[in-house]
Amino acid sequence: LSQSAISQRIKLLEARVGQPVLVRATPPSPTEVGRQLLNHVQQVRLLERDLQRQVPALDEEGMPERLRIALNADSLATWWAGAVGNFCAQQNVLTDLVVEDQEVGLKRMRAGEVAACLCGSERPVAGARSLLLGAMRYRALASPGFMARHFPQGFVASRLARTPAIVYGPDDFLQHRYLASLGIEDGFLHHLCPSSEGFLRMTEAGLGWGLVPELQAREQLASGQLVEICSDTPIDVPLYWHHWRNGGQLLAQLTDHLRHTAQQ
């Protein structure tokens, strides 16, 4: 399709619904009605797949279904692939993963951009359900060299805001929560590193302290490459799986699979 053809179809759709479906900006974004239409299309596509499986003659192309899912980088770097690998292979499913912080992933679903998401919020958007899968345990870690430089006499909480931290991105408030738990409410020095793997490598290199998933740092903790800056002060972050209520059999099966995997 040409750009002019796409523009014409959008105008025809807007004439039909009687209002704009797109905000003409850079980049463009859907209006509230546009988001409702996107959500509807997501659900209809999943329901169509159910029908094609029941009536194979309708599936002329025979292509795998693609699920667009928002999830946080730490889940992707640790447990996600192992949890869904067999399911995707057996169901012939491709995934289109959108990496967002666990605090904001739900915005993608509300905007109609994804069929499901993992996030830290329990409250689902309209037309969706949420399921608690469990919690990711984070520990505040640093390299022994970092601790020797910044805390030569031992850890002092009041000095933590003046030592470099590592933050995943502007929507990552985990370090803020940790500092608040120690009575520190002011701003703090920090690097920005939008990569879960890079976050861990920067911590290992002594560039700063950071909250790292326990799952991701087991080897480093066991070898002494990383240490807790303050012993036994973990933060548990709940993980909720959000999915459309009318998302079809495939999404329901994936939800059941994740529920069963989480129970193990």
For the regions a protein language model found, what residue spans apply to each?
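Flexible hinge/capping segments at coil-to-helix
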Residues: 128-166
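A late-sequence structural motif
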Residues: 231-264
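Alpha-helical linker/hinge and terminal dimerization helices associated
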Residues: 16-17, 37-61, 258
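Secondary-structure junction motif
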Residues: 161-185
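Hydrophobic hinge/microswitch elements
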Residues: 110, 184-229
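Helix-turn-helix DNA-binding motif, specifically the short coil turn and the N-cap/start of the second
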Residues: 1-5, 9
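A short LG(V/I)-centered, amphipathic sequence patch enriched
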Residues: 12-32
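Central regulatory/effector-binding core of bacterial HTH transcription factors
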Residues: 63-126
